[in-house]
Amino acid sequence: MVPHLRTALTGPLAELEVKMLGATPMIERWFRMEWQEHTPPFYSSVDVRNAGFKLAPVDTNLFPGGFNNLAEEMFPLATQAAMAAIEKYCSDARNIIIVPELHSRNPFYLQNVAQLSKIMRLTGLNVRLGSLDDDITAPTEIALADGQTLTIEPLERNGRRLTLGQGTFDPCTILLNNDL
């Protein structure tokens, strides 16, 4: 299955795109072999410029903000990838806190966080959003443009651990989606 992002572009595929799609098994194998030798970050994104005859990476982000661009049919693949990544870092994971950025100028960023949360929930994890922002002193509901809501809670320091809900939600993993 090839990931398809939502886009306004239509029409026939360019020659380069046809070649890339034809080489998908070879490309996927190369990534698989590299990931056996090198542990990749939990997640990242790469902005790619397509000149029609060559592709070039122009930016790499350790805290990706484009999960809201995934087509609905991509959620099974995204969930499978998330499960594999979680398994590497914490095989018995049950609880995860995602720490989003709260002051993004991108109006779609929080929809991205909602989709990332959905992917993590589909893996079977209990997912909550936490913040170190001094303005978040109690669970705070944020309305999104698409009608969804997110609840962000203040992170609490309990010794060397970060928890939520007066220590009742103790994650085995904290996932930053925030440049801090």
Residue ranges and their predicted role:
Residues 1-180:
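Preference for protein termini
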